[in-house]
Amino acid sequence: GRDAYIAQPENCVYECAKNSYCNDLCTKNGAKSGYCQWLGKYGNACWCEDLPDNVPIRIPGKCHF
């Protein structure tokens, strides 16, 4: 697994306010844990720790809604 911003299918981050929201999202996707990273590179976004390799992560480039 890897530590990364979990991404939606359009390469967009999951915006957040609460750590609990991200921890639920990350663990549901197989990560060990997750939290809401405040004021990071992509604003307030969910960061997952030890996320499985088959789960999409935010990569450089545009986010397409």
Curated annotation (Swiss-Prot):
Q: Which GO terms describe its biological process?
A: defense response
Q: Which GO terms describe its molecular function?
A: sodium channel inhibitor activity; toxin activity
The cysteines covalently paired via disulfide bonds are C12-C63, C16-C36, C22-C46, C26-C48
Please report the stretch or stretches of sequence annotated as the LCN-type CS-alpha/beta domain.
2-64
Extract one GO cellular component term from the record.
Answer: extracellular region
Subcellular location(s) per record: Secreted
Q: Which PROSITE patterns match?
A: LCN_CSAB
Q: Which InterPro entries match?
A: LCN-type_CS_alpha_beta_dom (IPR044062), Scorpion_toxin-like (IPR003614), Scorpion_toxin-like_sf (IPR036574), Scorpion_toxinL (IPR018218), Scorpion_toxinL/defensin (IPR002061)
Pfam annotation, one family: Toxin_3
Main location as per UniProt: secreted
In what tissue types does this protein appear?
Answer: Expressed by the venom gland.
Instruction: Enumerate the UniProt keywords alphabetically.
Output: Disulfide bond, Ion channel impairing toxin, Neurotoxin, Secreted, Toxin, Voltage-gated sodium channel impairing toxin
Q: Which family does it belong to?
A: Belongs to the long (4 C-C) scorpion toxin superfamily. Sodium channel inhibitor family. Alpha subfamily.
Q: What does this protein do?
A: Alpha toxins bind voltage-independently at site-3 of sodium channels (Nav) and inhibit the inactivation of the activated channels, thereby blocking neuronal transmission. This alpha-like toxin is highly toxic to mice and insects.
| Domains as described in the record | Has the structural arrangement of an alpha-helix connected to antiparallel beta-sheets by disulfide bonds (CS-alpha/beta).
Q: What is this protein called?
A: Alpha-like toxin Bom4
Q: Native species of this protein? A: Buthus occitanus mardochei (Moroccan scorpion)
